[in-house]
């Protein structure tokens, strides 16, 4: 497109819109920059100022500014100067004053400020805390980290730039270490870095003059410096133990001693040569609250609290720094509770009971360099992240505040600990893991908080936004990429360096109940000259931005609480459409910007989902119900209407007032049910025949695209319509045109195209799907007359797109379209894990960019090579707007998240490497060699044995036994060249099994019948009572009984209590067998299973009943219960039967008067089968 604007009074000065395009027809021989910042000097700037002041009205036009720059020896080509003039002219009046000129220079220098790159997209503490139980009996009183790598690093080993990313190695135990928690009962618990319990131990007190309150340990990883163990006690003394870490120093294991105890007096006398002690007696007059030893500075830091203000009068040495014999006192009111030393920054951060956080220079103790105020309680923990320039402080009320170390400003206040920890818990311990960037909070719970964690580059390349990316645009004037997200952020990126130039937060907001809520940005576009940005939000608001300085130029709105789904900015007009089902037109003419907007006729019956425009010809809009309407751009009148379910049907453009009323009423009803739910469309106009419009037309339109180079004829397909079924329909926007063709654009069930784009000449169609796939279609000869079709050079396409090269097998993306001749699919690969919401193309460098629901915006070459993710922490690829990307034939890497789920097609396209069939042929050669070796080995065996053995090898007089359950390992003799296997087979002779006699006890039990011992029960049912009236049977003695069963054993010698209906015993105590007082195992022999069964039977009979039913009472007249057992010895053994069941409360266990024991023993039934 080409539009001409009159720049000034000079009629020869014309500015064409096409000149701002990166694909201008001018052939650029070399890269030219229109930046003045690198070429202008102070003297030249002063001369330009004088020229501006001498100009009429202190304003200059297009040609005047060029002459002024040439007067100060600054020259540009016509193409470069036109771009420069449009960048400076922010008011779009083609007249520049001194303020505009200086503002352009100021904003350019601000873009080069490194501090602008440090602003984070998310808060330092954005992840929810992890909470788990401590597994201690009481609250944790101490917490520390058992680590292998030290936090202190020699200065010569510290890198100049600390990387804000990691490769995942910090999760290893060697790097992360183990957490150790202790409680007041003396219990220690060891935890992994991810708070998984490992083991527990018990601590003991040491023999020191005073109890130790705090400790610190300093060491280097290289082991070249003596390690320091610092102890601070309750009396204000500090003791230092120094030793060499070579061969573990004093911690060497000694044979026979699992624990080595040391007495401090022996350490002072030098009886332990490996330890070098040093004492600082009465360093403070109060207890030592915190200690630290810096190996780099060879300095000891010790702090104490001085809460007695009357005694110290505010001049207390809260922190003392001891270096050799020199002492420096940091005098702070009320003393210091905690401090942190950042050696790389040479700063010291202190916190105390006075609620202030002070930042000191380590070498200046007279006054702090900054005082951070904002806490309402005493400071109990502080730590610093030097690589992020952040200071974290925690107060007594469990509120965490994050501060900027350079600007000394508050970044975040995190108060989730107040909700998680009960208010009665005040003694909370904190420890910061500097390697993992975790803050561990310990009380009665363990809480792990991520503090500005590093980016795991082995899992992701980073994020572009803090929420899904909704719109990605390329500005051809400033040559940058603008991304808008659902986090209400607008970010300007330099795609050639990967740097973030400008970030605008909280762009669309709304106040609800006094709280400011961010509104998601859902649509955006540029003005015709691409100097301003128009954004639309989910609440119906519209804003025009001068995004180079983050200034809102104008505010607009469609109907309230109606999402804006598409915005179009043409000359002098702005079109916005969305859930209000109509097109709203705003004026963009100077002097008429703030008039009432114009509402186009409401012909749609459902929410508008997408729209596109072709300058000078028309606008197309599509709805959620599948309606498509073509409008005249000049008049705003519709001229064609289609439905995607039946695109050949003619639909009359008729607006009924009754339909509009019913539609408005349904809209109000649906708004009450929630803004996220789609409205019900009323098709019939009669109230008694209201039907759901979505039931008849379930297919919705996801995206529309106008091909700008296709002419407006009925034979040219100029509009592409994407449906949620995966198809793309092609229409002609001519008055007599209509539906032409359709093709299937996805290869997975349930997938659909969400966004489309094309290059400047409409040769390729770029699509992004809901499953994260990027597909490129060759549409040069698609839906055009036969006479205009051109020949396609397939070798050239195969060079550009590796997807077209032949594969060993037909991949899934190719199988779906094998019967679809046009359009030709030239590339298909997975670019994101989630849906692609926006896609665009930069023509001259042939770069494709995509914005996805996975918070990232990625750049690709046209062939599918991965260039990078905007916002990544990794080094950026070298790109230029004047050279084609991806022509250096280097190895391109894959996104880490895609690498784990990529198919063979995606791996081939992104990496640019196709494996040929040479590997298969080499493998066949190896297989032939293996077969040749097998044949040679078989021939050697044949030659050794002269002739092969005949089947059956073992003859007909032997039958192989069944396979044993137990695995029998065969040890072969491998000393000989060949092993006859059959000589090693184990053959066992068959023997007859000996039938063992059955013990009399078993036979007697088997012959018994329960009917001999139980009699029928006489009873009747009383309907007025709640139980069965059963008459007790009369007791009778059985002749010849060996013993009498007591009544408390639960048995009666007569009729037992039974159920009157079933005739079964009512007591659940015993089984069906008659209990016995003694038993004899006289026939027991080793290996007799039947004899062993008697003991098990007795065990089951005794254990299945009640505690009293199965155990006979010992009778002194008959002696004790005896059981003789023949186990090879003539003398019988006495076996005491113990009861295994537990006694009920309140009962007294029975005793066993065993002659072998000599005294009564408690009967706990114990029957063993170990005989």
Swiss-Prot record:
SUPFAM superfamilies: EF-hand (SSF47473), WD40 repeat-like (SSF50978). WD repeats lie at residues 157-201, 331-370, 374-413, 464-503, 516-555, 603-643, 748-787, 831-870. Keywords: Repeat, WD repeat. Coiled coil: none annotated. PROSITE patterns: WD_REPEATS_1, WD_REPEATS_2, WD_REPEATS_REGION. Residues 1094-1106, 1161-1171 have a biased composition (Polar residues). It comes from the Eukaryota. Residues 1076-1171 are annotated as: Disordered. Pfam families: WD40. This is WD repeat-containing protein on Y chromosome. It comes from Drosophila grimshawi (Hawaiian fruit fly).
């Amino acid at each position: 497109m080409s539009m001409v604007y009159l720049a000034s009074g000079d009629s020869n000065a014309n500015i064409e819109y096409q000149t701002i395009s990166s694909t201008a027809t001018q052939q650029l021989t070399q890269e030219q920059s229109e930046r003045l910042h690198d070429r202008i000097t102070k003297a030249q700037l002063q001369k330009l100022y004088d020229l501006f002041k001498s100009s009429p009205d202190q304003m200059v036009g297009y040609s005047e500014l060029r002459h002024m720059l040439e007067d100060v020896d600054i020259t540009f080509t016509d193409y470069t100067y036109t771009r420069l003039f449009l960048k400076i002219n922010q008011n779009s009046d083609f007249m520049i004053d001194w303020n505009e000129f200086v503002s352009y220079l100021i904003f350019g220098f601000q873009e080069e400020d490194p501090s602008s790159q440090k602003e984070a997209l998310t808060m330092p503490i954005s992840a929810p805390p992890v909470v788990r139980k401590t597994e201690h009996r009481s609250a944790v009183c101490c917490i520390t980290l058992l680590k292998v790598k030290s936090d202190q690093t020699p200065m010569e080993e510290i890198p100049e730039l600390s990387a804000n990313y990691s490769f995942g190695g910090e999760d290893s135990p060697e790097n992360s270490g183990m957490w150790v928690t202790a409680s007041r009962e003396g219990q220690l618990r060891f935890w992994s870095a991810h708070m998984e319990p490992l083991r527990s131990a018990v601590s003991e007190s040491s023999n020191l003059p005073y109890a130790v309150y705090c400790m610190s340990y300093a060491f280097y990883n290289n082991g070249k410096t003596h390690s320091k163990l610092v102890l601070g006690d309750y009396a204000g003394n500090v003791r230092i133990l120094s030793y060499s870490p070579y061969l573990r120093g004093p911690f060497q294991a000694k044979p026979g001693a699992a624990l080595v105890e040391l007495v401090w007096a022996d350490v002072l006398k030098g009886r332990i040569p490996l330890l070098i002690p040093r004492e600082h007696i009465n360093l403070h007059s109060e207890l030592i609250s915190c200690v630290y030893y810096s190996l780099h500075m060879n300095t000891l830091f010790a702090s104490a609290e001085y809460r007695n203000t009357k005694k110290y009068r505010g001049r207390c040495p809260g922190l003392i720094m001891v270096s050799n014999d020199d002492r420096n006192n940091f005098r702070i009111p009320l003393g210091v509770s905690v401090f942190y030393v950042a050696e790389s920054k040479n700063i010291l951060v202190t916190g105390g009971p006075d609620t202030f956080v002070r930042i000191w220079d380590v070498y200046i103790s007279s006054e702090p360099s900054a005082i951070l105020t904002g806490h309402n309680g005493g400071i109990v923990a502080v730590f610093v992240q030097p690589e992020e320039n952040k200071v974290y402080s925690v107060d007594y009320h469990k509120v965490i505040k994050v501060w900027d170390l350079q600007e000394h400003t508050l970044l975040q206040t995190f108060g989730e600990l107040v909700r998680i920890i009960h208010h009665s818990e005040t003694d909370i311990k904190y420890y910061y893991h500097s390697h993992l960037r975790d803050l561990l909070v310990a009380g009665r719970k363990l809480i792990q908080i991520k503090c500005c964690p590093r980016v795991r580059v082995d899992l992701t390349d980073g994020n572009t936004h803090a929420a899904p990316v909704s719109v990605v645009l390329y500005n051809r004037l400033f040559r940058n990429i603008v991304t808008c997200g659902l986090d209400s952020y607008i970010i300007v990126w330099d795609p050639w360096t990967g740097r973030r130039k400008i970030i605008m937060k909280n762009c669309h907001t709304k106040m609800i109940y006094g709280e400011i809520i961010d509104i998601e940005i859902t649509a955006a576009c540029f003005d015709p000259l691409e100097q301003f940005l128009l954004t639309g939000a989910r609440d119906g608001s519209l804003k025009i931005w001068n995004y180079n300085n983050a200034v809102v130029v104008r505010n607009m709105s469609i109907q309230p609480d109606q999402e804006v789904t598409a915005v179009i900015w043409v000359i002098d007009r702005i079109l916005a459409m969305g859930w209000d089902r109509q097109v709203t037109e705003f004026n963009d003419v100077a002097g008429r910007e703030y008039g009432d907007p114009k509402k186009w006729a409401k012909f749609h019956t459902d929410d508008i989902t997408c729209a596109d425009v072709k300058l000078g010809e028309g606008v197309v809009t599509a709805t959620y119900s599948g309606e498509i309407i073509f409008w005249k751009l000049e008049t705003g009148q519709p001229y064609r209407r289609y439905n995607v379910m039946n695109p050949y049907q003619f639909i009359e453009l008729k607006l009924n007032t009754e339909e509009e009323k019913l539609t408005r009423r349904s809209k109000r009803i649906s708004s009450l049910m929630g803004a996220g739910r789609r409205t019900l469309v009323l098709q019939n106009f009669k109230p008694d025949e209201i039907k759901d419009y979505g039931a008849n037309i379930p297919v919705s339109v996801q995206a529309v695209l106008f091909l700008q180079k296709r002419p407006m004829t009925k034979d040219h397909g100029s509009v592409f319509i994407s449906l949620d079924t995966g198809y793309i329909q092609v229409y002609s926007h001519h008055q007599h045109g209509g539906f032409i063709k359709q093709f299937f654009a996805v290869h997975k069930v349930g997938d659909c195209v969400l966004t489309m784009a094309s290059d400047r000449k409409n040769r390729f169609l770029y699509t992004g799907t809901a499953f994260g796939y990027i597909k490129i279609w060759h549409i040069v000869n698609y839906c055009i007359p036969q006479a205009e079709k051109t020949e396609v050079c397939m070798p050239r396409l195969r060079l550009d797109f590796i997807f077209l090269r032949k594969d060993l097998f037909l991949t899934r993306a190719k199988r779906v379209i094998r019967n679809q001749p046009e359009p030709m699919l030239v590339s298909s690969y997975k670019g994101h894990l989630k849906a692609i919401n926006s896609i665009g193309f930069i023509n001259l460098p042939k770069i494709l960019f995509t914005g996805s629901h996975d918070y990232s915006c990625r750049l690709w070459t046209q062939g599918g090579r991965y260039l990078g993710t905007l916002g990544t922490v990794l080094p950026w690829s070298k790109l230029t707007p004047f050279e084609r990307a991806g022509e250096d034939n280097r190895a391109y890497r894959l996104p880490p998240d895609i690498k784990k789920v990529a198919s063979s097609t995606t791996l081939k396209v992104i990496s640019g490497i196709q494996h040929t069939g040479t590997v298969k042929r080499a493998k066949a050669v190896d297989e032939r060699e293996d077969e040749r070796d097998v044949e040679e080995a078989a021939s050697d065996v044949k030659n050794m044995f002269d002739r092969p053995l005949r089947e059956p090898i073992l003859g007909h007089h032997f039958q192989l036994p069944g396979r044993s359950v137990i695995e029998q390992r065969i040890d072969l003799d491998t000393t000989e060249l060949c092993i006859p296997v059959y000589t090693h087979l184990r053959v066992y002779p068959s023997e007859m099994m000996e039938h063992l006699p059955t013990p009399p006890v078993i036979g007697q039990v088997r012959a018994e019948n329960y009917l001999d011992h139980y009699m029928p029960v006489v009873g009747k049912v009383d309907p007025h009572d709640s139980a069965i009236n059963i008459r007790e049977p009369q007791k009778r003695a059985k002749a010849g009984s060996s013993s009498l069963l007591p009544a408390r054993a639960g048995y009666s010698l007569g009729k037992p209590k039974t159920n009157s209906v079933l005739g079964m015993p009512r007591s659940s105590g015993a089984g069906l067998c008659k209990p016995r007082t003694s038993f004899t195992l006289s026939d027991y022999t080793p290996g007799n299973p039947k004899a062993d069964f008697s003991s098990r039977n007795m065990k089951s009979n005794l254990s299945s009943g009640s505690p009293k039913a199965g155990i006979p009472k010992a009778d002194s007249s008959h002696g004790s219960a005896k059981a003789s057992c023949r186990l090879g010895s003539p003398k019988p053994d006495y076996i005491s039967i113990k009861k295994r069941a537990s006694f009920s409360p309140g009962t007294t266990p029975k005793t066993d008067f065993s002659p072998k024991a000599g005294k009564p023993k408690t009967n706990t039934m114990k029957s063993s089968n170990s005989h």
